[in-house]
Amino acid sequence: MIFEGKEYEFPIVVGTENEKAINIEKLRALTGLITLDSGYKNTGSCKSAVTFLDGERGILRYRGYNIEELAAKAEFLEVAYLLIFGELPTAEEYDDFKRTIHKYTLVHEDMRHIMDGFPRSAHPMGVLASATSALTAFNPVPVNVNCPKHVYQAVCKAIAKVTIIASWVYRKREGLPLNYYDNKKGYIENILRLFFEIPTEEYKINPTIVSALNKLLILHGDHEQNCSTSTVRLVGSSEAGLFASISSGVSALWGRLHGGANQAVIEMLEEIHADGGGVDKFINKAKDKNDPFRLMGFGHRVYKNFDPRAKIIKVAADDVLNALGIDDPIFGIAKHLEKVALEDEYFKSRNLYPNVDFYSGIIYKALGMHLEMFTVLFAIGRLPGWIAQWKEMRQGGEPIGRPRQIYVGATERPFVELNKR
C-alpha cells in the first residue's frame, strides 16, 4: 500500500479453506488511516473455527462437517455439542450431555412472576430477550472460561433454561399453563410438548414433525458471523455474562432483515392471498425497481448460489404438509411462487433463489405457530451457535470490540447562550 509517498506492507492471513484476508491491525498505528466498510461487507472481525461458509459455491459446514450430512444423520443436541466443543460426542459424552441438560431444565419459580409481568400482547422476542437477561439474576456467578467443568455446566444450563423460557413465552401468549421438561423424552419431542401440550389431552408425537423440526434447528445452528452472532461476540468481548450475551443475540435476531425474515415471508404470502392469489402480479412488482414491494424469502446476503439449507428444508416442509394433511391456500401460493421464481430468467440471473426463511416460515405456520413466534423457534436453533461463538471468543482472549468511525458532523463551534438563540 502506498500512502503520501510511503509504502506499507500488511500481512496476508490464509484460512484452512484458503480464504485470504489482509491483516490491517497495525494500519492506524502506521498510517493514521482507518478503513470504512458500512455493513462490514468486506471486514473479517475474527478468526473462527466454528463454521465455514462459501457463498459462491453454496457450501456450509459446521466444524468441517457438511450441513447436508449433519441434517440427514445427526440429532440437534449432537450438533449443538459439535458446535460448542469442536467434535462430535462419543456415545458416553452424548449421554452425559443430555443428562446434564435435563438436570438444569427446572427454572427458578420466581421467573414465573417475571413472566407474569409481561402483557400477553408483548412481542415474543421482546419477552424472550428480557427473560433471558433476567436469568442472569438467578445465575450471578460469572462463567470461569478457563475451567472446563464450569464452562460445561454453563453451556448445559443455557441450553436447558433458554429452551424452557422460550416455551413459556409461547404458552403465556396463548393463555396456557406453563409447562416443564419431561426427562423421559428426547429434546425435540420435548420442544413440541413444551409448546403445544394442553393439560386435558395426551400430546401425540408425530415422527415426521420431529424429524422436520430436528432438521430445521440443525440448519439454524450457526451461520458464521451474521448480525446476531457478531452481536453476541461483541457484547461478550466486554466480559458480559453468557445469558446477557445470548439476550443481545435474541434482540439482534428479532429484526425483520435477520431472524424476522421467516415471519415476513408468511406476511407476504398472506398479502398475495388477500389480493386474490395472483402470483404473476407480485412477480412483476418485485421486478419493478420503482415499486417498494420486495419478494421475501428469496436471495441471501452471502449466498450467490442456492442456499444449501433451503434444499434440505424444502423437502422437510413438503413432508410436514403431507403428514398434517393441511389444505391452506397460503401453501399453494408458496409453491406457485417458488416455481415461477425458479424458472424466471430475471430471478435466475440475479441468483434470487428461495432461502431457508422461505421454507422455515411454512413449517412454523403448519405447526400452528403464531407469526410472531417464528423467530423464537429460530432462536432455539441458533442458541448453540451463539454459545459456541461466545466460548471461542472468550477463551481466545480477544480484545473488547471497539469499531471506529468517520465523523461527518459539525466542526468546532462556540456555545451560544440560551437568551441569544
Predicted region positions:
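Non-transmembrane, aqueous-exposed alpha-helical and coiled segments at domain scale
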Residues: 1-421
